[in-house]
From Swiss-Prot:
This is sn-glycerol-3-phosphate import ATP-binding protein UgpC. It is found in: Cell inner membrane. The complex is composed of two ATP-binding proteins (UgpC), two transmembrane proteins (UgpA and UgpE) and a solute-binding protein (UgpB). It holds the Pfam family ABC_tran.
């Protein structure tokens, strides 16, 4: 196991396009950190740079005390698990798991011991003599993980390993990955665009946007204390409600919405009020009236979508919002609900820079 450190790491392509902009990051020994962000943000590029599959334009990457910029992928002592499993179709499960170890000329007894240990841990020991095409998607992903485990690497790298699985299996596999990582205590980097997956797996999240780290921290820290508009809108399901507002010197306003108690916000600047669906409540004395459009029933909770009377989006349409309620809160479409939210639980951002002001 080892610490991983990135120092001012950049990636510039020959045409001058920059993919990664001076990333600084330290990943502690035994930590599971998740790179999360939208497609094309640079998260997989950053992972591939750690793996040695993508060159570094400038900066340094260290595993332990060793700078690995010019070290070949096979010598970095990392193991990677891919989205598409990358199994050899003509080999058995045992053959896939042992292939890399045989190439290293490892002792046969040691190879068999490692395969047996990993297969037992992953509950695939009964499949060792099967071919990949005889396995389910989840079983194949376990084999891919087993192939990484038997190497006893210093660092695990996961590149969207659950993307090809159905929803139920994704939940099951992410629990297994978390349990496995805790048991082995191996430094791990996990890439995903699925923020629910990121929140449930990570010791810490690195939210990446356009090749830069917007914010790093524990999952609930980023949910409760987002540094930017991007982080607030990306982290959290359902998504945060964002309402355009302006500051008139004493209150933030949008049509019939007026919330006082502010004195230090800029005037003449477009602002966004961010309110999480779980901090909105029904109250006859609430600040706004919601017209119910759709109710999604999720078993233990309901998500209620609608628009707010007299409050408008940036396009001039009625502002859409989402309210998270208990399973007993089940209004009908076209019902009206008066809503209250605690201003102290809301956020205010500059629209132009994304900076959080409150």
């Amino acid at each position: 196991m080892a610490q991983v450190e990135l120092k001012q790491v950049r990636k510039t392509y020959p045409n001058g396009a920059e993919a990664i902009f001076g990333v600084d990051m330290k990943i502690d020994d035994g930590e599971l950190i998740v790179f999360v962000g939208p497609s094309g943000c640079g998260k997989s590029t950053l992972l591939r740079m750690v793996a040695g599959l993508e060159s570094i334009s400038s900066g340094e990457i260290l595993i332990g005390d060793r700078v690995i910029n010019d070290v070949s992928p096979s010598e970095r002592d990392v193991a990677m698990v891919f989205q598409n499993y990358a199994l050899y179709p003509h080999m058995s499960v045992r053959g896939n798991m042992s292939y890399g170890l045989k190439n290293r000329k490892m002792d046969k007894e040691e190879i068999e011991r490692r395969i047996t240990d990993a297969a037992t841990m992953l509950k695939i020991d009964q499949f060792l003599d099967r071919q990949p095409n005889q396995l389910s998607g989840g079983q194949r992903q376990r084999v891919a993980m087993g192939r990484a485990i038997v190497r006893h690497p210093q660092v695990f790298l996961f590149d969207e390993p659950l993307s090809n699985l159905d929803a139920k299996l994704r939940v099951q596999m992410r629990i297994e990955i978390k349990k496995l990582q805790r048991r082995m205590n191996v430094t791990s980097i996990y890439v995903t665009h699925d923020q629910t997956e990121a929140m449930t797996l990570a010791d810490r999240l690195a939210v990446i946007n356009e090749g830069q780290i917007e914010q790093m921290g524990a999952p609930m820290e980023l949910y409760s204390n987002p540094a930017t508009l991007f982080v607030a809108s990306f982290i959290g399901a359902p998504q945060i409600n964002l309402i355009p507002v302006a500051f008139d010197g004493s209150a933030i306003v949008n049509g019939d919405l007026r919330i006082g108690g502010f004195s230090d916000l800029p005037m003449g600047v477009d602002l966004k009020l961010g309110v999480r669906p779980d901090v909105m409540t029904i109250d006859p004395e609430g600040q706004v009236m919601m017209n119910v459009d759709i109710v999604e029933q999720h078993g233990g909770e309901n998500l209620i979508y609608g628009t707010i009377d007299g409050v408008f989006s940036g396009e001039g349409e009625p502002q859409e919002v989402c309210l998270k309620g208990s399973q007993t809160l089940l209004p009908n479409p076209d019902d009206k609900l008066r809503l209250r939210f605690d201003p102290d639980a809301a956020f205010i951002f500059r629209t132009d820079t994304g900076e959080r002001l409150k």
